[in-house]
């Protein structure tokens, strides 16, 4: 079997889902970003700096780097927009400084079974009731 561009199409669906279906228009990076932005403000920096990818589909070559790059673009864009808005509000008379979020995406070598390992660990803990 000869596989051409199709080999690149599968992982691209995570980043451009509209390729498969026009109804799916939110890329994975945007979903991760939206999820973190719904968390309490004081936890966001820690969440952005410790994003862990799991599952067999994340083993595509460059997946974690691509996700990190796309998230960095979103975070940087929002940071610059916020700085600009603050400067405009203060009439540009004040130097505005802020610390941009650090985005770090990691994946273990055994990420295809990481979800199972995590679930198995939690289930083995004494405090987990069988009815939970």
Task: Describe the function of each predicted region.
Residues 1-132:
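C-terminal region/appendage detector
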């Amino acid at each position: 079997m000869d596989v051409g561009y199709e080999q690149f199409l599968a992982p691209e669906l995570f980043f451009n889902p509209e390729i498969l279906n026009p109804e799916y228009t939110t890329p994975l990076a945007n979903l991760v970003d939206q999820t973190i932005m719904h968390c309490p403000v004081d936890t966001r920096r820690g969440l952005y700096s410790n994003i862990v990818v799991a599952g067999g589909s994340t083993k595509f070559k460059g997946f974690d780097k691509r996700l990190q790059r796309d998230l960095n673009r979103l975070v940087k864009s929002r940071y610059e927009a916020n700085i600009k808005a603050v400067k405009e509000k203060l009439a540009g008379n004040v130097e505005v400084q802020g610390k941009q979020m650090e985005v770090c995406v990691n994946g273990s070598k055994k990420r295809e079974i990481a979800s199972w390992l995590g679930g198995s660990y939690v289930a083995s803990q004494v405090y987990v009731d069988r009815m939970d």
